[in-house]
Structures are given as structure tokens and as C-alpha cells.
């Protein structure tokens, strides 16, 4: 088995700087409105986001970035591909509904680019001043020679694990319950990942505005909870 199969765990390990990020992404607002009260409601929220949330668009964009990296590496249509890369990166970052979410994306991307550099995979191309998390994730997977399906799966797994880590602190749901939820999410993560692999960006539907609205009310709360 290729070591690239194991390198993906560097990206999702909660003990490393990348996986160690713990952002609540609006969960406190749900908690305050009593929409988030136990492990079942947490599980339902995460499943809803995986099925119709914006995280699907982020995951789909990983594939476009990955393909562009291949083209750039082979020096095919270099100027056009680089411009497309920069435009997509700026677009997905600007699509975030709150200043806090954009700041989260930028911080996580910068940290992952720094980690990649330490691994010997410094980013080779021109970047925007502010970069998106999907761009950094795709670059890591490209450098680690992780398959595109595994790239999407680990991205969604890491996102869901992050939400559960936040829920552990703010509800709390208990670590055993969180593990059970993560286990139950594996099937939906696998299904959604394969669906995304078969779709173009324009075919990705997302319509869950609840979390987006909640995110705009959570900046002070998550700062208190997760600054350390």
C-alpha cells in the first residue's frame, strides 16, 4: 500500500495544527435558540449540512483545484489555468456568509500552507492575498498523491469531526456519543463524496440557509469558547 494512503491522516489528526482547529460555525446560535439540545439534534444538523449545505460546494471545488494543479504541473495553458485557480479561490472565499467564516478559512489555509512547506511541499504558484481552505486542502492532497475520492472523503470527515469537537464543548454531548455519531456519519460521507465526484460545480445544489444565518450571530461566543 502506498504511503500516500496513510499521509491523509496527517490532515485529519486532531492532535496536529491542521486537524486541531475547533470552530463552532454557528453552533452556539443554534444552542441559544434551543434548536441544538442533544446528540440527536447535533447529528441531524451535520447530516443536513452534508446533504444540502455549502460544505458540498467546498468539497466539489477541491476537484477543480486538483485538476488545475495537474495542468499547471504539465505546463498546459499555464496562464489561463493560473487565472482560473485564482478566480475560483477568490470566489469560494467570498461566498462565505460572515466575516468570521472568511477569517476562519484564511487562518486554516495559511496554517496548512505553512505545514506543507515544512513537509517539503511549498506552494509553487501565485496566490491571492487571502486564500481559501479548499485550495490549501487540495494542494496538500495533490502533493501527498492522495486520490481525488479520498481527498473529498477526508475533507468531509474532517469538517464533521470539527463540528462534533465543538459540540463536545458547548452542549456537551459526551465523547462516546460523539464517536457514535462520527461512526454513523461514515456512510453518508461516503455517499455524498461519490455524488460530488459525479457532478459539475453548476450541478451542486445547496440550500441550507439556517447555518449561514446562525454563523452571523456567533462571533463573540466562539471567540470566548475557542480562542485557546
From Swiss-Prot:
GO molecular function annotations of the record: nickel cation binding
Top-level taxon of origin: Bacteria
Record has Hydrolase as a keyword: no
Subcellular location: Cytoplasm
Annotated InterPro entries: UreF, UreF_sf
GO cellular component: cytoplasm
Cytoplasm among keywords: yes
Keywords of this entry: Chaperone, Cytoplasm, Nickel insertion
Signal sequence, renumbered to the chain: none
Family affiliation: Belongs to the UreF family.
Function: Required for maturation of urease via the functional incorporation of the urease nickel metallocenter.
Assembly and binders: UreD, UreF and UreG form a complex that acts as a GTP-hydrolysis-dependent molecular chaperone, activating the urease apoprotein by helping to assemble the nickel containing metallocenter of UreC. The UreE protein probably delivers the nickel.
Cited HAMAP family: UreF
Descriptive protein name: Urease accessory protein UreF
Organism name: Prochlorococcus marinus (strain MIT 9215)
Amino acid at each position: 500500500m502506498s504511503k500516500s494512503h496513510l499521509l491523509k491522516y496527517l490532515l485529519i489528526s486532531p492532535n496536529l495544527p491542521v486537524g486541531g482547529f475547533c470552530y463552532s460555525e454557528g453552533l452556539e446560535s443554534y444552542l441559544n435558540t434551543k434548536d441544538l439540545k442533544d446528540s440527536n439534534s447535533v447529528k441531524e444538523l451535520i447530516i443536513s449540512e452534508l446533504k444540502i449545505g455549502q460544505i458540498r460546494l467546498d468539497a466539489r471545488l477541491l476537484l477543480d483545484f486538483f485538476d488545475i494543479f495537474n495542468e499547471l504541473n504539465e505546463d498546459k495553458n499555464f496562464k489561463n489555468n493560473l487565472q482560473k485557480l485564482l478566480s475560483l479561490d477568490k470566489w469560494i472565499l467570498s461566498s462565505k456568509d460572515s466575516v468570521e467564516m472568511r477569517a476562519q478559512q484564511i487562518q486554516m489555509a495559511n496554517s496548512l500552507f505553512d505545514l506543507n512547506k515544512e513537509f517539503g511541499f511549498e506552494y509553487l504558484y501565485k496566490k491571492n492575498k487571502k486564500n481559501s481552505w479548499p485550495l490549501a486542502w487540495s494542494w496538500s492532497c495533490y502533493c501527498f498523491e492522495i486520490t481525488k475520492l479520498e481527498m473529498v472523503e477526508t475533507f468531509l470527515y474532517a469538517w464533521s469531526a470539527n463540528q462534533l469537537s465543538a459540540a463536545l464543548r458547548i452542549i456537551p454531548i459526551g465523547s462516546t456519543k460523539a464517536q457514535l455519531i462520527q461512526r454513523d456519519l461514515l456512510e453518508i460521507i461516503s455517499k455524498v463524496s461519490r455524488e460530488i465526484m459525479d457532478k459539475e460545480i453548476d450541478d451542486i445544489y445547496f440550500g441550507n440557509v439556517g447555518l449561514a444565518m446562525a454563523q452571523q450571530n456567533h462571533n463573540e461566543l466562539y471567540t470566548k469558547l475557542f480562542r485557546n
